[in-house]
């Protein structure tokens, strides 16, 4: 019997490409749950590069018009899969503190959770995949699906970024090496501890990200063209994707311009007021300027978001 492999695909085509080459080298049945906006749907419906046995689109038929929520069903899901649904919900960048376009009610959150749980479990029960291949989840629905699969008999293969810049890790858990509980007892074989630390400094994620943003994010002309394309497009995402609820064009433009102005004001203040020389002998408290909307301080650290 052929292995059944379920892929989670999004706007990053890494896993679509993986599915394409995997199918050439391994005789298996490939399925896909696809998390994209409306416009790219046509590509996945017509493409012939990957022979998917069946595909599903994440946001299809997820609505906010459900007045009732089946709390007993959600309780059953928590007990069966060992989940704390509120912990996942409250640490999502869209549902809680960081999404300024729409405020979800308690009933909204539970209704969306119930709909996604039923949808995902029906897919999993229908195909019973042997493997689930995905990138590290970033949003609530992807994390919920991952948790449901992880706590079943299906083998997860999560592509994530370790602390070494330019490197990737495939494991069952995000950023954790399989079968290793702690790194303290792992012997150094090919490199000494000091050599590994030097390697870590050379392969810094910060350097990789800085180079990327310098190449991709500094063109004011591209920024203007992107804004004009956005204003001219007939987008309906705010009607079909909960991650876009309330994101009208006027609100998005205002939020973007407001963010640019605030950044300039704060940057000017920091350059003018904050000391630039570090006094090593003076007692200090280290307070990093955290990026709250990233997974590493939300889903990965659910009790440290304040």
Segments (PLM) and residue ranges:
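Nucleotide-activated donor-dependent transferases that construct or modify glycoconjugates
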Residues: 1-12, 34-36, 105, 133, ...
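Structural motif
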Residues: 4, 130-131, 283-284
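A short, glycine/small-residue-rich beta-strand->loop->alpha-helix junction that serves as a flexible
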Residues: 7-17, 134-136, 295-302
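Short, well-ordered alpha-helical microsegments
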Residues: 14-17, 40-41, 140-143
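Conserved N-terminal ligand/cofactor-binding loop architecture of enzyme catalytic domains
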Residues: 21, 25, 31-120, 163-264
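Conserved nucleotide-sugar donor-interacting segment of glycosyltransferase catalytic cores
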Residues: 119-180
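Short amphipathic alpha-helices and their capping/turn segments at secondary-structure boundaries
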Residues: 267-281
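Active-site donor-nucleotide binding/catalytic segment of nucleotide-sugar enzymes
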Residues: 279-306
């Amino acid at each position: 019997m052929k292995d059944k492999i379920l892929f989670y695909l999004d706007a990053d085509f890494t896993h679509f490409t993986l599915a394409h080459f995997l199918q050439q080298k391994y005789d298996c049945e490939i399925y896909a749950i696809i998390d994209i906006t409306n416009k790219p749907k046509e590509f996945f419906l017509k493409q012939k590069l990957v022979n998917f046995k069946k595909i599903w689109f994440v946001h299809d038929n997820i609505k906010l018009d459900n007045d009732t929520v089946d709390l007993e069903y959600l309780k059953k899901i928590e007990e069966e899969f060992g989940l704390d649904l509120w912990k996942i919900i409250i640490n999502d960048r869209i549902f809680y503190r960081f999404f300024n376009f729409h405020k979800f009610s308690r009933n909204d959150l539970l209704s969306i959770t119930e709909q996604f749980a039923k949808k995902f479990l029906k897919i999993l029960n229908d195909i019973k995949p042997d493997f689930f291949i995905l990138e590290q989840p970033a949003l609530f629905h992807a994390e919920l699906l991952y948790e449901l699969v992880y706590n079943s008999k299906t083998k997860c293969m999560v592509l994530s970024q370790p602390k070494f810049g330019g490197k990737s890790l495939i494991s069952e858990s995000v950023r954790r090496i399989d079968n290793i509980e702690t790194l303290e007892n792992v012997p150094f074989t090919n490199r000494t501890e000091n050599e590994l630390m030097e390697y870590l400094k050379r392969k810094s994620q910060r350097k990789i990200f800085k180079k990327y943003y310098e190449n991709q994010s500094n063109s004011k002309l591209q920024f203007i063209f992107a804004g004009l394309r956005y204003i001219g497009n007939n987008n309906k995402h705010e009607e079909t994707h909960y991650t876009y609820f309330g994101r009208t064009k006027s609100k998005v433009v205002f939020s973007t311009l407001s963010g640019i102005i605030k950044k300039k004001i704060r940057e000017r203040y920091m350059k003018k007021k904050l000391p630039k020389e570090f006094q090593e002998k003076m007692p200090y408290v280290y307070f990093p300027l955290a990026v709250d909307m990233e997974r590493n301080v939300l889903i990965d650290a659910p009790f440290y978001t304040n």
